[in-house]
Amino acid sequence: MDRVTRYPILGIPQAHRGTGLVLDGDTSYTYHLVCMGPEASGWGQDEPQTWPTDHRAQQGVQRQGVSYSVHAYTGQPSPRGLHSENREDEGWQVYRLGARDAHQGRPTWALRPEDGEDKEMKTYRLDAGDADPRRLCDLERERWAVIQGQAVRKSSTVATLQGTPDHGDPRTPGPPRSTPLEENVVDREQIDFLAARQQFLSLEQANKGAPHSSPARGTPAGTTPGASQAPKAFNKPHLANGHVVPIKPQVKGVVREENKVRAVPTWASVQVVDDPGSLASVESPGTPKETPIEREIRLAQEREADLREQRGLRQATDHQELVEIPTRPLLTKLSLITAPRRERGRPSLYVQRDIVQETQREEDHRREGLHVGRASTPDWVSEGPQPGLRRALSSDSILSPAPDARAADPAPEVRKVNRIPPDAYQPYLSPGTPQLEFSAFGAFGKPSSLSTAEAKAATSPKATMSPRHLSESSGKPLSTKQEASKPPRGCPQANRGVVRWEYFRLRPLRFRAPDEPQQAQVPHVWGWEVAGAPALRLQKSQSSDLLERERESVLRREQEVAEERRNALFPEVFSPTPDENSDQNSRSSSQASGITGSYSVSESPFFSPIHLHSNVAWTVEDPVDSAPPGQRKKEQWYAGINPSDGINSEVLEAIRVTRHKNAMAERWESRIYASEEDD
């Protein structure tokens, strides 16, 4: 293709055989007209140069008396070995093959000078009118040799055309002569990119096993060297220089290619000039030719192999290489092998570590302290698997005085806690309660007629407590039946954890201990018990029962001390109400101690309130118990004063502020939604 005019040089109609040629790279060829005097007549190495007579006549047509031979150089500097550097001294003149005449189909061809050369250059134009038919035949032969010389090898070595006498028409296929130009050296194929891409993919699949074998071996061995390497399944017409060339059947195409190559006359035989710039040597005739993409793949793979050898890496066996990065696990105790991929809901490693430690702590607690005092499983279940009820965070495992039922498998030494002995609780318990009896099994208040099977069930390590034990501090369900079966204590029975208002009522001090002794607790029979099974008992844990009794005794003691103090200070004020059982008890107790009626202690100078108020009798009215409880709830507290308290009622009425309401708001509250004026 001409660089300036963009016309295909090979589009000349006479050159229809050369249309399959591909022109590598820059298709503008530079021709040096080398001076061929009689002293420079021997161009061949061995044979002398002899010109035919009509050729000498053709030389006479040209204006200088020297003979010219054509050298073709493809897009690179001229070989330094052939010519000296001084162009002007030797009188070289550079010409370019004009493509315009060739494209217009004229039988003549022109040698045009390049633009950048000296002004000394002369333009030689060989017109058809100047030459006779014999000269035209010679010119045609020369032009055909030039076109043949343009089929240069891909390794961009220089092909020099050298003349030898031959009169035969080059188009007539004579006996093929052996020339240095083999058909696998000449690359005549136009690049078909779709075919090349498919060939590239098939090469990749073929070379997966051995990636460093040269890609040329992946081509089928049956393809003839002259034939195109594009897949033959595509019967589209080939593109040659932008023109569609119909593909002949394959065998004929191969024969034509052979004729085209081997029918070069000997005076236009192509000789490969050794160029120091050209790297690739002549390929051996056995290897099939290589497409450009294959060559790029091969070079890239060789480059990668060289880099691997330099850096000491082993050969890549596969395209997907797995690189192992040595890591150190964060937590060596946790085995994360079961969950290799992190799920979204999975906790972090530290949370997992805490969970593991908590579970371990629960296990140790359960191993240490499955004690008798809890809800023991019946012994007909005790052979089965242990129920999943945990006792992890309760203080009962520490406070329980029972011996370790599972001392056979000891817990870690760190988690062993010294138990608080039950004798330490004894001074704090109320004097009316009997001494704590701790049987060998640690069951509180258990009847001595307990059978050995039930004792075994009580001491079995399977005994666990319901997880509701934290809300029920005594370990007993808060039911009225259970409270009814409980023996009455000295103070009115309250819901546990709730301080009743009766604790702070002003009453005289009682000094009477409860008469009846502490009864053993009657076990309650629940409705869900199996008929054939032994009774499933819910028993209080000893430690929680100790805490409960201590709390009740402390409350009772506080109440008694408060009443004693009030009674000593203001004896006339507090007249007990006769309607309560506890008040009858307290009155009888105060009568028994001889503190009845009004009295004043005038001897002691420290009781000044009694001196002041000794002659005045104040009475405190208890809240009216006859009112239903719903009505008492309706009375609102005002300014922090309980309206059910009879003392403060007058003060409350005195300081109560009447609400100032809008008239419309009052009508709205009295459900008068429309005024009379609107009607």
Curated annotation (Swiss-Prot):
Subunit structure: Associates with F-actin. Interacts with DCTN1; this interaction regulates DCTN1 distribution at the cell cortex. Interacts with PTK2/FAK and MAPRE1.
Keywords: Actin-binding, Cell cycle, Cell division, Cell junction, Coiled coil, Cytoplasm, Cytoskeleton, Mitosis, Phosphoprotein
Renumbered residue ranges of the record's region Disordered: 151-182, 206-245, 360-419, 447-494, 557-598, 622-643
Outcome following mutation: residue 224 to A: Almost complete loss of CDK1 phosphorylation in vitro, loss of PLK1-binding, no effect on cortical localization
Effect the entry attributes to changing residue 397 to A: Drastic reduction in PLK1 phosphorylation in vitro, no effect on cortical localization
Keyword Hydrolase: no
GO cellular component: actin filament; cell cortex; focal adhesion; intracellular membrane-bounded organelle; plasma membrane; spindle pole centrosome
Effect of residue 377 to A: Almost complete loss of CDK1 phosphorylation in vitro, loss of PLK1-binding, no effect on cortical localization
First-listed, main subcellular location of the protein, grouped into a coarse class: other
Cited Pfam families: AKAP2_C (PF15304)
Entry's family note: Belongs to the MISP family.
Source organism of this protein record: Homo sapiens
Modified residues (Phosphoserine): 78, 156, 214, 284, 348, 382, 394-395, 397, 400, 430, 471, 541, 543, 575, 582, 586, 675
Listed name of the protein: Mitotic interactor and substrate of PLK1
Record gene name: MISP
Biased composition (Basic and acidic residues): 360-371, 557-567
Coiled-coil annotated residue ranges, if any: 545-569
Superkingdom of source: Eukaryota
Impact noted for substituting residue 284 to A: Almost complete loss of CDK1 phosphorylation in vitro, loss of PLK1-binding, no effect on cortical localization
Reported impact of residue 397 to D: No effect on cortical localization
